[in-house]
Amino acid sequence: MTQLEFIEQIIKEKEAVILDANDKIWSYAELPYEETRSSALLCSILESEGFTVETGVAEIPTAFVARYVVGTGKPVMGILGEFDALATLSQKAGCTVKDPVQNGGSGHG
């Protein structure tokens, strides 16, 4: 099995969890620095997968770092994930024309 095939297999195995998290984060539509439910959800998922999670990073309550160490801990990979919503961009998921969930509400539109 190639490394790419291994990664594809893991993604397929975790597909339901990934899609559920995506849908929940979309529906929460939390503004910057207020992503408490989204952050808690992601931390919970990462912890259940064996990651060590540090919350409140840089004195931001919703910021976190998740670490998963195997062997020597090398190489190191960093990912920055943006999942906050923006004011007035409320939008129904899967819709390609403007169709807000709530007029003037926050969202990922």
What are these regions (language model features)?
Residues 2-109:
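Acidic/His- and Gly-rich active-site-bordering loop/insert found
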